[in-house]
């Protein structure tokens, strides 16, 4: 081969290499070799989508920071200079405890929503502690109209029949601080010898923390609380590190200097005082168990012991979200509703419409309850009525990518509680659409003809979470394309524990060297104001029965034929079902309007609950949460029965401000505006796998609202997400199967916002 030929070949090789390099560079970005980027997915809904927000959409919106500020300014002017900031208030002070939305009367709200009447006055409800009056009391004041208040109306007598006794008031944060100061500065030094020996006691107990129990006493009028002491484990759950010491603090007096320790409990024995405990310890009469203050092998921490792995799965919206959130109003192609938070009762939704038709006026959490057992006084007496602490008040910021999908829409919540200025919980709600990874319906046919039809289950979810001391509750409202609404709550967080001593098998399981996981029940109560094709509804119960019969074509043989039983429930007592009693498998509210097939249009209440036994009715405090006895009760709706519980029930369950059982007074429920009251709950016997945290798996309960002859067929039949193809069609063609278009329709990268967290203090 001559040199000329070699030169030509070299030139051709160089040209080929250059061409290949150019091809490679075309496929790479112009930033020095990074791979080309997919376009970002749209971050907003396409403008052509049909859903819109009606002008009256903010009727149920929680109060804004500006409204809260205006109410507080007005109350300060009207109540005078003696008003103290609740953040620093002592029991003998006057202070504004809370301000929140006063919900409008239903008749006025519907007149506005449905008939265009002027909106009802926007009002606030304030709870005020009057500790400086000759007869200290608690008052409820309605303030309006907002945003420029001009009147204040005391509704305490109207709603409760008289002034609210002062001992029923919730415990302020300042009161807890004063109790801690009393315990650590005045009381614990009296037992410093024992505490040094057992618990690595430091000056004024700085390595220890207290945890409250409730209710506070044994009879109406008491205000005496058992406090457990725990190691203060930084960055982890102290709830698992009980040191075995519990103190009964009487804090009824208006002057904290007069508060006393009524009883002491230490590792299985009772004492009259810490001084007595110390004296017996010095005399060698106390059996002391030395408890390490560094946890048990780190299993108490939520920090993973392994490094991060590959990124987990991520759902995104390839063509932008298919819903919108404006203020408190959510709208999608199927659903519209308003959402909010009661400061004490927690999450609630209003004016729920499916394809434009109202199904529900209100679904709201009313109360949550945890009843404990154990062989220590704190464990055996604890009945946490969480509304007394505040399921809205203790709502927490939602952590993007853990508490909700990373790309969910996050909404803040403004509140005014124990403060003179409003605060904000960032990311208190999340709203998202989610593919459940499950078909809502489907059929694959190989019989006579060949076809497939189905619809992926895609739901719209609004979520919030509350952390009540050790437990975290997840509150979900799920909207399904079939017209069903699902209400679900989950429990997670840390278990409440007790110091391990004596015969503990009756009260739970040992979960670490010195820790008993104490048995308890969880229950939550919900108000469901269904308006099924109008305000006039009836309650129907349907079930099944096997009826013996002779076989028609062979009379000598017997057959058990399955039949449907139907019964109209006409009185409240008929529609009140106790926990553990037989409940109709189908119970639904129906209108006097029929569907195409002649059946009354109805919505079924389907419960998913495995509640523990309710507190026996002969208990002195059972009236304080009498709703717990009923898995379901349907009553006439009344404005004077807005809630099944009260923020004041926690501290006086013996003479409760609201007794739900009074709602069930055997009035007619035929053709009336009705409310269904639903209880969901479960028994929790803590076990080793509850360490470090209880998991949500298997610890979620709730109920469904499902259409029952409300439509003429399944409304999801009309879903644009439906898939259908025959055996003689090309299922890989876009015009046949929309899923075949995904490689093009979803060829985008989700626009992930930078991670942020709402923080650990509210601003």
UniProtKB/Swiss-Prot annotation:
Family indicated by similarity: Belongs to the copper/topaquinone oxidase family.
Name listed for the protein in its UniProt record: Amine oxidase [copper-containing] 3
Other remarks on this protein: Dubious isoform lacking the transmembrane domain and active sites and is therefore most probably catalytically inactive.
One BP annotation, GO: cell adhesion
Tissue: Strongly expressed on the high endothelial venules of peripheral lymph nodes and on hepatic endothelia. Also highly expressed in appendix, lung and small intestine. Expressed also in adipose tissue, in bone marrow, colon, heart, kidney, ovary, pancreas, placenta, prostate, skeletal muscle, spleen and testis. Isoform 2 seems to be the predominant transcript in fetal kidneys, fetal cartilage and fetal tonsils. The highest relative expression of isoform 2 occurs in skeletal muscle, heart, pancreas, kidney, and lung.
Entry's cofactor comment: Binds 1 copper ion per subunit.
Keyword set, alphabetical order: Calcium, Cell adhesion, Cell membrane, Copper, Disulfide bond, Glycoprotein, Membrane, Metal-binding, Oxidoreductase, Signal-anchor, TPQ, Transmembrane, Transmembrane helix
UniProt binding sites for Ca(2+) 1: 529-531, 673-674
S-S bonds: 198-199, 404-430, 734-741
Record-linked Pfam families: Cu_amine_oxid, Cu_amine_oxidN2, Cu_amine_oxidN3
Annotated organism of origin: Homo sapiens (Human)
Keyword Cell cycle part of the UniProt annotation: no
């Amino acid at each position: 081969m001559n040199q000329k030929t070699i030169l030509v070949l070299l030139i051709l090789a160089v040209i080929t290499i250059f061409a290949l390099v150019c091809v490679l560079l075309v496929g790479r970005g112009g930033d020095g070799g990074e791979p080309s980027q997919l376009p970002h997915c749209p971050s907003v809904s396409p403008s052509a989508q049909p859903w819109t927000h009606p002008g009256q959409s903010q009727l149920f919106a929680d109060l804004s920071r500006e409204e809260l500020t205006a109410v507080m300014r007005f109350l300060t002017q009207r109540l005078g200079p003696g008003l103290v900031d609740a953040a620093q208030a002592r029991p003998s002070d006057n202070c504004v405890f809370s301000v929140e939305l006063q919900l409008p009367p239903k008749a006025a709200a519907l007149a506005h929503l449905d008939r265009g009447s002027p909106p009802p006055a926007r009002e606030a409800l304030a709870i005020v502690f009057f500790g400086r009056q000759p007869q200290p009391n608690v008052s409820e004041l309605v303030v309006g109209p907002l945003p420029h208040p001009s009147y204040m109306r005391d509704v305490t007598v109207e709603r409760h029949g008289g002034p609210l006794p002062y001992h029923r008031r919730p415990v302020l944060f300042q009161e807890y601080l004063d109790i801690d100061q009393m315990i650590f500065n005045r009381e614990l030094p009296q037992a410093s010898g024992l505490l040094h020996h057992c618990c690595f006691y430091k000056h004024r107990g700085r390595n220890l923390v207290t945890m409250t129990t409730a209710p506070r006493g044994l009879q109406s009028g008491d205000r005496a609380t058992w406090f457990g002491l725990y190691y203060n484990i930084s960055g982890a759950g102290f709830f698992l590190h009980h040191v075995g010491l519990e103190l009964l603090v009487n804090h009824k007096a208006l002057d904290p200097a007069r508060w006393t320790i009524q009883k002491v409990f230490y590792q299985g024995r009772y004492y009259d005082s810490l001084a007595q405990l110390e004296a017996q310890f010095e005399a060698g009469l106390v059996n002391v168990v030395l408890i390490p203050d560094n946890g048990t092998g780190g299993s108490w921490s939520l920090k993973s012991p392994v490094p991060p792995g590959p990124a987990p799965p991520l759902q995104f919206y390839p063509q932008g979200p298919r819903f919108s959130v404006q203020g408190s109003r959510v709208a999608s192609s199927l659903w519209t509703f308003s959402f909010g938070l009661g400061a004490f009762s927690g999450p609630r939704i209003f004016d729920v419409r499916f394809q434009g038709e109202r199904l529900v006026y209100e679904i709201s959490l009313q109360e949550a309850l945890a009843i404990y057992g154990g062989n220590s006084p704190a464990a055996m007496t604890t009945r946490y009525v969480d509304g007394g602490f505040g399921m809205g008040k203790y709502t927490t910021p939602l952590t993007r990518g853990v508490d909700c999908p990373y790309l969910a829409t996050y909404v803040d919540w403004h509140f005014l509680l124990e403060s003179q200025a409003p605060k904000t919980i960032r990311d208190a709600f999340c709203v998202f659409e989610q593919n459940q990874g499950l078909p809502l319906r489907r059929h694959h046919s190989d019989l006579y003809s060949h076809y497939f039809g189905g619809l992926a289950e895609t739901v719209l979810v609004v979520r919030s979470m509350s952390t009540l001391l050790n437990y975290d509750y997840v509150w979900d409202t799920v909207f399904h394309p079939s017209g069903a609404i699902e209400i679900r709550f989950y429990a997670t967080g840390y278990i409440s524990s007790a110091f391990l001593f004596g015969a503990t098998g009756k009260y739970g399981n040992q979960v670490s060297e010195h820790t008993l996981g104490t048995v308890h029940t969880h229950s939550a109560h919900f108000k469901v104001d269904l308006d099924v094709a109008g305000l006039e509804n009836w309650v129907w119960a349907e079930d099944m029965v096997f009826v013996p019969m002779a076989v028609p074509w062979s009379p000598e043989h017997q057959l058990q034929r399955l039949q449907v039983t139907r019964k109209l429930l006409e009185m409240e007592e008929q529609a009140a079902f106790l926990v553990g009693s037989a409940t109709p498998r189908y119970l639904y509210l129906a209108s006097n309007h029929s569907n195409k097939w002649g059946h009354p249009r109805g919505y079924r209440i389907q419960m998913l609950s495995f509640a523990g036994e309710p507190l026996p009715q002969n208990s002195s405090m059972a009236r304080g949460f009498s709703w717990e006895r009923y898995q379901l009760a349907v009553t006439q709706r009344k404005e004077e029965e807005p809630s099944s519980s009260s923020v004041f029930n926690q501290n006086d369950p013996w003479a409760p401000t609201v007794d739900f059982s009074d709602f069930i007074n055997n009035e007619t429920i035929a053709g009336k505006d009705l409310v269904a009251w639903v209880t969901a709950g479960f028994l929790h016997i803590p076990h080793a796998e509850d360490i470090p945290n209880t998991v949500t798996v298997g610890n979620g309960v709730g109920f469904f609202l499902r259409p029952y002859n409300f439509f003429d067929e399944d409304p999801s039949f009309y879903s644009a997400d439906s898939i259908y193809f025959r055996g003689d069609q090309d299922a890989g063609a876009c015009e046949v199967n929309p899923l075949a278009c995904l490689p093009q329709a979803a060829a985008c990268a989700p626009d992930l916002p930078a991670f942020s967290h709402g923080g650990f203090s509210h601003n």
